[in-house]
Amino acid sequence: MTDILKKIEAYKRDEIAVAKHARPLGEIEAAARAAPRVRPFAGAIATSLAEGRTALIAEIKKASPSKGLIRADFDPPALARAYQRGGATCLSVLTDTPSFQGAPEFLGSARAAVDLPVLRKDFMYDTYQVAEARAWGADCILIIMAGVDDLLARDLADAAAAYGMDAIVEVHDDAELERALDLPCRLIGINNRNLRTFETSLETSERLAPRVPKDRIAIGESGIFTPQDVARLAKVGIGTILVGESLMRQEDVASATSQLLAV
């Protein structure tokens, strides 16, 4: 685990402890069961792919640790609608505050503005967070293999499945991919960002995608800026992409989204 992930895990575990005290597990589980019906996340992606379209998971992200503030004019419902108009298949919404200036209410308000499935993009270290995600309206969670052991990864995946949610299992090297394929999750995210240097390279996706079985869906994450990047990933069988920063920086998000997908 990188030093960055260790620092993140430390503050996330503090956050989780505070959240559990403020809202006990039984209460958050009840809220999760009462939340709006789950929208099929993997199902929406599979439909886009079956129709021959690139499946875009469009990310609503205000800031990042490496780039600082990305979008000052930050209106999650408006951004969600722009992404939907531009042809996005799903949304990803950052809910981590210290590193990304995200918030739970961003997820809820974005989801309410559209009919797209939504990923809670956050660092998950406890099944409490899965119940939290469902209570906030999330349809999918993220499991980052670089930050969790196999037992916790399995617990998170099982907790998501119990709520009818999907999980993206994120990897960035061969060893993590091998571990991810042991989980009963259809979505395999390949992060092109090196978690040690924060540099991005599409070569990571090009190297790992051929090892993803045909019954799984490979997702290219990070470092995707142009239709040429999208086409490059398509050559290795990646038809699903997660894009945030490059679209968040555009004045006309809907137009930029449709242009990215014009391949």
From Swiss-Prot:
Keyword set includes Lyase: yes
GO terms for biological process, alphabetical: L-tryptophan biosynthetic process
Catalyzed reactions: 1-(2-carboxyphenylamino)-1-deoxy-D-ribulose 5-phosphate + H(+) = (1S,2R)-1-C-(indol-3-yl)glycerol 3-phosphate + CO2 + H2O
CDD domains per the UniProt record, alphabetical: IGPS
Disulfide links within the chain: none
Pathway assigned in UniProt: Amino-acid biosynthesis; L-tryptophan biosynthesis; L-tryptophan from chorismate: step 4/5
Family: Belongs to the TrpC family.
Name of the protein this chain belongs to: Indole-3-glycerol phosphate synthase
Organism (species): Xanthobacter autotrophicus (strain ATCC BAA-1158 / Py2)
Gene: trpC
